Design a protein with these regions (language model features):
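Short, small-residue-biased leader/transition segments that mark boundaries at the very start
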Residues: 1-2
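A cross-kingdom feature marking charged/low-complexity
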Residues: 13-20, 26, 31, 79-98
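Amphipathic, hydrophobic secondary-structure cores in small proteins
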Residues: 35, 39-82, 86
Length: 98
């Protein structure tokens, strides 16, 4: 004999979340007083495959504005990019868009 209570049915229900799975996550690089601008440009080219011009644009945004969103997409890939940037000793974070 199988009895189901309302409490049990409630615990088995799918959790309600406001975050959609397809919401893009941002990879943000922050300015630091250590790395040379040419080095940061080179890292962007290697990690993201950016052209020199696009890499320089992001580097200058980091330099003058203090941060730049260098990539946006699925969370797993964004986490991977943040780890790669940390490997090059850049200050990078993962942010969920508002």
């Amino acid at each position: 004999m199988l009895f189901r209570s309302a409490a049990m049915a409630e615990t088995l229900a799918e959790p309600k979340t406001e975050t959609r799975l397809d919401t893009p996550w941002n990879v943000v690089v922050h300015n630091d007083p250590v790395n040379l601008m040419s080095y940061v440009t080179m890292v962007f080219q290697k990690v993201f495959g950016y052209s020199r011009e696009k890499a320089q644009t992001h580097m200058l945004e980091v330099h003058y504005r203090g941060r730049s969103i260098v990539w946006s997409g699925v969370r797993e890939r964004a986490e991977f990019y943040v780890q790669q940037l940390h490997g090059y000793l850049l200050l990078a974070t993962l942010e969920k868009p508002e």
